[in-house]
């Protein structure tokens, strides 16, 4: 038996129908379409507005489309991993809820938490599981209902985020020179003061005080986060290129975390990679946290060709960051959205 490689064999995605555009936001807070577009590059974002629906709904819709597209037998799935910052509940895991709704009879499921870096980290975990030889098919889902954490009276953060989910099927293959090649993943651990949600965890449990003082919303010091994101992501991209002896001309695609268009532009410029090789969809989805990378992959799938050199990179709360080098395993044009 040859070396086992872990390859993505299909991509699914889902975004809610409701579109919250900049014009509507300008009626909610003191902002303008021009200000938002210039600062972060976002024109609109999707919001899950139906009551009683959470992240598991988004994840299930993306996974269901993935299963239908690939034609994979659900009974052959070994594991399902959901990476999210906005789980339905503290427990049980969102992944277990998704698994139950999909009717996966022979799989186990668990959640993974790495904020906006979640998909990058989880793809590496799934690849390692596949390469161990113990598992053959794993569904990885990045999903977030960021609207549940956003304070729509805070113009600094409410313009940034949207809801969505992306899913990939990761399978085992003995084909050479395809799939996840290697990763460079890092955690700073000093980022807590700059990006967090103050209440709701074991340090500061929910109470009348935390609700009254609006402590259950996302808190971010934007300028500091921007600076760290640009520095870390650009260094990570250059490191993964160095590890694999890649020049800028060798890179076909960069799939970045879609947090801010200016961050994406700065990162790729530092790495010497032209913007036309970068998948950018932040203008119409906003920052969907763990969902940004798989949603970008979903949008770009039809353009990807077998053998393409793809670099994933992301940055999130913690701070967590990294990059991975992936050789695409199929012609994406064969699949439609």
What function would you assign to each model-found segment?
Residues 1-50, 154-227, 231, 235, ...:
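Condensing-enzyme catalytic core mediating Claisen C-C bond formation in acyl metabolism
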Residues 9, 83, 113, 138-144, ...:
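Short beta-strand segments
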Residues 20, 91-93, 150-154, 321-325:
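Short acidic, glycine/serine/threonine-rich loops at helix termini
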Residues 29-38, 89-103, 139-146, 202-210, ...:
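Acidic-glycine-rich active-site phosphate/pyrophosphate-binding loop
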Residues 42-44, 76-81, 100-113, 149-153, ...:
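Glycine/charged-rich beta-loop-alpha catalytic/anionic-binding loops adjacent to active sites
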Residues 56, 60-63, 67, 86-87, ...:
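Claisen-condensing/thiolase-fold acyl-transfer catalytic domains that form or cleave C-C bonds
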Residues 75-83, 248-257:
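Short glycine-rich phosphate-binding loop at a beta-alpha junction
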Residues 131-165:
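Flexible, glycine-rich active-site loops centered on histidine and acidic residues
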């Amino acid at each position: 038996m040859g070396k086992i490689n872990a390859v993505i064999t299909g991509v699914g995605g889902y975004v809610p129908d409701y579109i919250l555009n900049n014009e509507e936001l300008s009626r909610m807070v003191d902002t303008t379409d021009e200000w938002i577009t210039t600062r972060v590059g976002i024109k609109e974002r999707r919001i899950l507005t139906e009551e009683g629906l959470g992240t598991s709904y988004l994840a299930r819709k993306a996974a269901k489309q993935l299963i239908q597209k690939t034609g994979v037998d659900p009974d052959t799935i070994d594991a399902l991993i959901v990476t999210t910052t906005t789980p339905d509940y503290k427990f049980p895991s969102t992944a277990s809820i998704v698994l139950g709704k999909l009717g996966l009879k022979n799989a186990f499921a668990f959640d993974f938490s790495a904020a906006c870096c979640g998909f990058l980290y989880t793809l590496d975990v799934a690849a390692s599981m596949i390469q161990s030889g113990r598992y053959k098919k794993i569904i990885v889902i990045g999903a977030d209902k960021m609207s549940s954490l956003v304070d729509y009276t805070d113009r600094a953060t409410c313009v940034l985020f949207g809801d969505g989910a992306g899913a990939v099927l990761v399978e085992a293959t003995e084909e050479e020179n395809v799939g996840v090649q290697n990763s460079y993943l890092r955690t700073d651990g000093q980022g807590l003061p700059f990006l967090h949600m103050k209440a709701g965890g074991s340090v500061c449990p929910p109470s009348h005080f935390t609700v009254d003082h609006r402590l259950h919303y996302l808190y971010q010091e934007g300028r500091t986060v921007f600076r760290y994101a640009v520095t870390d992501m650009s260094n990570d991209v250059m490191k993964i290129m160095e590890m694999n002896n890649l020049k800028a001309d060798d890179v076909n695609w960069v799939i970045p975390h879609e947090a801010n268009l200016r961050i994406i532009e700065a990162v790729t410029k530092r790495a010497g990679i032209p913007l036309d090789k970068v998948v950018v969809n932040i203008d119409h989805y906003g920052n969907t946290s763990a969902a940004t990378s798989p949603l970008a992959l979903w949008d770009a799938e039809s353009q990807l060709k077998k053998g393409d050199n793809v670099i994933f990179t992301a940055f999130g709360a913690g701070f967590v960051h990294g990059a991975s080098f992936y050789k695409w395993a199929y012609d994406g044009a064969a699949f439609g959205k």
